[in-house]
């Protein structure tokens, strides 16, 4: 009996001179290992950021949520003009909005612990930072917002948990108080 083999399809892409020179420069400078890994990365970003829904240029969506590319300084200026005692509440509201977006767009229920790996991956893809679970702790490495109070509220609203900050500088560590 013959075993069914997975066929590999070869594809030829005709690039403009400028496009090819750009790709070659990425490879030459060590920013990309080769054309195949670059294309694979681009497709991964295309899928994970739902670029097929974008109305390029200038109107970007990820499911039901409109996405805007803003620099972190913009976010920091906004936060600096909001009283510190409101940061947890603002974070919580943002987390609740992110929860609705993930559920409606990705069919991921963020308040179920079995989905947290997928939730953390989504946050990482969108540039929020690197999120990890360690026992009853959530760790955020390289957060794009440097105010732990905002993250405390955000994660509480998103994940439906009660947290206590264990560090006030990045990497942030939050203990889950209602951990079961």
Q: How should these model regions be labeled?
A:
Residues 48-90:
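N-terminal leader/targeting helix
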Residues 170-180:
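A generic structural motif
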Residues 22, 33-59:
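Short, basic amphipathic alpha-helical segments that act as recognition/interaction helices
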Residues 1-20, 27:
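Short Lys/Arg-rich basic patches
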Residues 73-139:
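An N-terminal amphipathic alpha-helical segment
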Residues 118-171:
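Short, hydrophobic/π-rich interface segment
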């Amino acid at each position: 009996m013959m075993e069914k083999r997975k066929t590999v399809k070869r594809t030829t892409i005709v690039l403009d001179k400028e496009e090819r020179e750009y790709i070659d420069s990425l490879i030459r400078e060590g920013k990309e290992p080769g054309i195949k890994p670059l294309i694979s990365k681009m497709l991964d970003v295309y899928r994970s950021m739902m670029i097929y829904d974008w109305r390029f240029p200038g109107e970007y969506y990820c499911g039901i949520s409109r996405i805007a590319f803003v620099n972190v300084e913009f976010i920091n200026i906004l936060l600096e003009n909001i009283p510190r005692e409101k940061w947890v509440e603002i974070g919580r509201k943002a987390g609740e909005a992110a929860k609705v977006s993930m559920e409606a767009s990705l069919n991921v229920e963020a308040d179920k612990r079995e989905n947290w790996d997928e939730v953390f991956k989504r946050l990482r893809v969108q540039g929020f930072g690197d999120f990890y679970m360690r026992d009853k702790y959530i760790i955020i490495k390289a957060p794009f917002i440097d105010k732990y109070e905002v993250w405390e509220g955000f994660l509480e609203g998103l994940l439906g948990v009660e947290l206590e900050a264990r560090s006030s500088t990045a990497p942030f560590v939050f203990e889950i108080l209602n951990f079961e």
